[in-house]
Structure formats: structure tokens, C-alpha cells
Amino acid sequence: MAVITKIEVQKRSKERFNVYIDKGQGEEYGFSVNEVILIKHGLQKGLEIDEIALGNILYNEEVQKAYLQAISYLSYQMRTKLEIEDFLRKKEVGQAIISEVVSKLLHDRYINDKEYAILYTRTQSNVNRKGPTVIKRELLNKGVQDLIIMHSLQEYTKEKQIENALILIEKKKKSYQKHSFLQMKLKLDEMLVRKGYSRDVIQICLEELKDEKDDEKQQEALHYHGNKYYEKYKKYDGWTFENKMKQALYRKGFSIDEIEIFLQMKREEG
């Protein structure tokens, strides 16, 4: 049995208190607690506490400490239940305490995976223009349940997905100006897959791109790559030269007809 002999406020933190006790051998430092724990256990000078009571006090102090760490972590941005659990594990908090902290955070509505999923979906679709597949994968990695994700993605309509995908295409296609139209389409297709769009949405968007095909830019790309390969393969004669040229340009996405026209032009120049 110990008796509390003195309680004083810590100099560096007004919300924490040092508790001094006497176990029969004079006053000594016992432990420190948060103000919440001080009030919860009614700690005051003269109070007698046994080993069981002391164990409860120290356990609740650890819970409160972990709770405040979680609150601080949440102050930067919303987090999922799993993210909070992972954060506390990295802080070497025990599982029993983690469970209590998470339960309290859920009760106090500091964490809510449903709200998180809705806001995350809106941000990733409106700001980063990610497709549903990527958003779903990221939410699953954050521990959000399938049903919650399905609900959050309902407001991400197909029309909005097409709008976002077309914006991405418009931004990216400028960097493919020296590619053939076919190769540009393939690269844009790959980009949209990485961004998380469905095959259906990608097909619709690339069909719209087909209507915008620029013959002049296609010719510029053909001449750019054709002249580059011409310099590379001009050391070869006849059939070998033409075969290497055709293979190289075909791999770049140009049609046989386009390649034949280019080679004919080179023959006439020669």
C-alpha cells in the first residue's frame, strides 16, 4: 500500500502531473499522469492506492497517451481505422491499448471509414483524376471494406470518368507528337489503364480521339522517324535496307501504305 504525498504540475506541460508517494520509507517519485487520468481516478494528497489500483492508473495513462498520439496524427488529415492501428503499432503500443484507443476514436467520431472513403473518392477523382480501379485499390490498402468502397464510388459516374479521361488524354498527347497515331493511342491506352479506368471508358475516349486524327502531324512523325531510321540503315543495300526500314517504322505504328509512300519519296530523292 502507498499513500500519495504530493501532486505537482510538470514545468514543461501544464496538463501533466508528477505524483509522489510514500510506501513506508519516505516520500519518493511515483509516476506521472495526464490531467484526464488524475481526475478520472480522483488522485489527491492522502489517497491510499494498492498495487491493483496503481496498475489500473498506469494502464489508463498508457491508453490516454496513445489516444493523444492518435489525435495528433489525425490533426494533419483524416485517417482510416487501419491507418491509426498501423501508426500506433509503429509507436510500439500494445494491441489491447490499440483496441481501446480505436474504440474511443470511433465513438468520438474522429475516425469514420465511410466518410473517409467518400471524401477520398471525391478528391482523387476531382483533383488527381484517378479512375475507379486505382481508387478502389488504394482504399483497400487503407483497410476500407469492399461495401464501403462500392458505396463511395457510386457518385463517380461513367460520364465523370469519361470527362476526366479525356482531360488526361488532352494533357498527355502533346508529349507524343513525334509518335505515329497508332503508337500514341497505345501509349494513351497504357496511361489510362495505369490511372485506373475501365476498358469500356478507355475505348469510348480513344474513339473520340480517332475523330481528331491529324494527318499533318502523322506525316511529321513519319518523316521524323523515317529520316532517323534512314540514317541508321542507309549502309545496307536493296532488299535488306527496305526490309529493315519497313520493320522499324511498322513497329512505330505506321501503316504499310504510309511506309511505302515514304520509301518511294526517298527513292526519288536518291
Curated annotation (Swiss-Prot):
Family note: Belongs to the RecX family.
Name assigned to this protein: Regulatory protein RecX
Organism annotation: Bacillus thuringiensis subsp. konkukian (strain 97-27)
Record's function text: Modulates RecA activity.
UniProt-listed Pfam families: RecX_HTH1, RecX_HTH2, RecX_HTH3
Keyword field: Cytoplasm
Positions of transmembrane segments: none
Gene Ontology terms: cellular component: cytoplasm
Signal peptide: none
Gene Ontology biological-process annotations: regulation of DNA repair
PANTHER family linked to this entry: REGULATORY PROTEIN RECX FAMILY PROTEIN
Subcellular location per the Swiss-Prot or TrEMBL entry: Cytoplasm
NCBIfam families assigned: PRK14135.1
